[in-house]
Amino acid sequence: MLTNKTMDILYKRIVNDERLSLTHFSIYMALLFLWYKNEMNNPFPMSRQHVMALSHLHSIATYHKCLTQLQLYGYIQYHPSYSYYTRSTIYLENIL
């Protein structure tokens, strides 16, 4: 279960990482919300449209760039699905 201490550690980690922009933060918070709604299971399914709506993004290119960078920086593992009928999966790194 996420405690206030865990949330504080996550927040400080993201805020103190100068490589991340507000867009990265917005996407990560959307993913954290979806992870929580999925009963905190890793990995969890997600759709681009849902994450973009939650993070208030309109550019698919920006979404993919930031998602790739979050993976490169060690915040997530992203496993894309190239099928219209199967959702991509996300694994949040070092969450608990």
Where are these regions (language model features)?
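Winged helix-turn-helix DNA-binding recognition segment
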Residues: 36-96
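Short recognition helix of helix-turn-helix/winged-helix DNA-binding domains
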Residues: 1-54, 72
